[in-house]
Structures are given as structure tokens and as C-alpha cells.
Amino acid sequence: MTRIGTPLSPSATRVLLCGSGELGKEVAIELQRLGCEVIAVDRYGNAPAMQVAHRSHVISMLDGAALRAVIEQEKPHYIVPEIEAIATATLVELEAEGYTVVPTARAAQLTMNREGIRRLAAEELGLPTSPYHFADTFEDYRRGVERVGYPCVVKPIMSSSGKGQSVLKGPDDLQAAWDYAQEGGRAGKGRVIVEGFIDFDYEITLLTVRHVDGTTFCAPIGHRQVKGDYHESWQPQAMSAQALAESERVARAVTEALGGRGLFGVELFVKGDQVWFSEVSPRPHDTGLVTLISQDLSEFALHARAILGLPIPVIRQLGPSASAVILVEGKSRQVAFANLGAALSEADTALRLFGKPEVDGQRRMGVALARDESIDAARAKATRAAQAVRVEL
């Protein structure tokens, strides 16, 4: 039986977010709608989720002692990681001491880097993946590329949003790809994965919810990546019944192995009826932002319900829908957005402006959402809305 108290009172149900970006912001809002007290933690101040949380803390998320100090101070009922780069060994310790980590500390630890989850999927679960090789040194990396063959992809074992990721078409790309991966890694100390290139038709995110009554799948989400970073997503992605069934089989296997309750973003490659496992996030997925307009319960609402042990009797997909990212390039601590009336002038459109405190280089600062009669029409409408937004640095 789920019981939720009153925020800021002795009966409060406290949820602590480890990471406070745009996905965490939506999770915080959904948890507050259900009466939770939300504490947001991240490495920089005024992060999006902090702007809607009851309280916030700024610490290095990779500093285990600092993370433990905040958690022991706040005594949350649920610890909810929103990013990969966290001191996961500390989460494992805290879970052993009786804290609840969503979905589990092991899931956070295995998915913190590409090696843990790839070895689980391919070697323990026997799921289909691309050929791969892990390397710590340039020489080992070169051997790995020779073994996997061209074209191939090299990525730091720890990075997000495509940082440090590149495609190698031949030996001339070896050094540049290695150097870029070394710059893009967050905390993997130079280790990389070399992956064989799968000639897929499309890639999907299958949002998979492990909740009190079992496992439920959202309709598949198609997406377009630029240099490994999401720019556009849509739901539903058209696919054969056989490919969908295989996608659900793979997603169920990997999420069952990770355990716990919550929403997972399972990334898959699809060619015809064949499916390969790519990656999994044990939390809402950026491509799933489309669910803010495509479903009656967004991925964030589903995550909140699953965390709190509430039922999810049905997930209604509302028709062809799309999201298009609002990217900002430049340097500013006072970004403003104009021409919003034009961006929202068409029916069935919406915007989310994330409220990130600064941009230095290129940063995802918002997303446009749209529904229409077909996926092509929804994508075009979302793109028009995103492009209509005028950014002032």
C-alpha cells in the first residue's frame, strides 16, 4: 500500500534526484503532483529540476563522500539517479544500508558505463549486439578496430549525448577518433569501446516500465541522431509485428536483469525483422520527451508512478507525434527566447523551455512538440515550431 505524506512536514515522502537536468525537472513535477517532497542535487546551481524542487544541493556527483553527506542529511525515501556520472559505489553502499535506489543501485552501476551493460547483455543474457572490443591503450584500440573491422564506431565507455563518439571509415581515422574519445570521456579514465557498425534500417527507444503489476511497454519511438546526440524523435515508429515482439523480448530480458521498479529507455537497432540491443538507461530517456504530447501518461509520469508503487493500468498513445530539439549555440548566462507566438501558432503544438542557466558552446535548451495525422506531418510541424523560436544570447 502506497502512502504519501505532506511535503515539508514530518510525514513527507522525500525523493532525492541525483542529477537535475530537463528530464529530472519533469520527474520532479510529476512527483510533486503526487504530493512528494523533492530534493534536487547536481554539480551546478540553478539546474532545471532545482527550479521546481523543494530544496537543492550543489556537489560533484562523482564525489562519494559528498553524495553520502547530502543523502544522510536529507534521509530520502527514494534516491533517483537522473544521470550516469554518479558515485555509484556509494549508491551500492547506501542501498545495503537500507536506502531505496531507483530502480536499483546495481542498475545505476552497470549502466554508468558502456562496458558493464554491454557485457551483461551480450555475455550473460546472450542478447544480439554489434561485435565489440574494449581498450585502454592506443595499441589495444588499434587491434580492436582491426578485429571488428571498418566501418566501426568508437565511444568513451563513459559519456553522454554523443560526446567523444565518432565513426571510423578507414585507418586514416584511427588517431583522430582516439583523441576525440579521450576528450569526450567523463570518468572512464581513457577506456573506449569499439563497436562494429550495424547496417540498420532505423533505431528505436522502447520505453519499458517495471511497475507494481508487472512490465508494460510504450509504443516504439523512432529518433534521429546527429553525432550521437538526439535531435528529433517520433512515436509510434512503424515496424513489423515480428520486430516489435523481438524488441519487447530483448527489453524485458535486460530490464528484468537490472531489476527494481521504474522506467527504462532501451535503445535498439532494427533491420527488417532483426533486432540488436544497443544501450539502456534505467531512467527516462531524452528521445522520450515526445511522450509529453504523444501519451496520456508521459515517461516522467510513468516513472513517478512506478517509483511510488502505483498501478499503471493502461498507457494511451494519442496519435502520430514528434519532438524537435531547440539547440542554442554561443555563450550566454541570460539566454532569452522570442517569437514564441509563431512557434505555437499551429494546433497541437507545445514547447518546453528547460531554463538551463547558461550556454557555452552548443546546448539543448528546449524542445518543440507536435501531433498530426501522420508521423511525417508531426515531424515537419515540430521542426517548424522549433525553428520559429528565436534565441537571444
UniProtKB/Swiss-Prot annotation:
One of the record's GO cellular component terms: cytosol
Residue sites binding ATP per the record: 114, 155, 160-165, 195-198, 203
Binding-site residues, Mg(2+): 267, 279
EC assignment: 6.3.1.21
NCBIfam families referenced in this protein's UniProt entry, alphabetically: PRK09288.1 (NF006766), purT (TIGR01142)
Classification via HAMAP family: PurT
Role this protein plays: Involved in the de novo purine biosynthesis. Catalyzes the transfer of formate to 5-phospho-ribosyl-glycinamide (GAR), producing 5-phospho-ribosyl-N-formylglycinamide (FGAR). Formate is provided by PurU via hydrolysis of 10-formyl-tetrahydrofolate.
Protein name: Formate-dependent phosphoribosylglycinamide formyltransferase
Organism encoding this protein: Pseudomonas aeruginosa (strain ATCC 15692 / DSM 22644 / CIP 104116 / JCM 14847 / LMG 12228 / 1C / PRS 101 / PAO1)
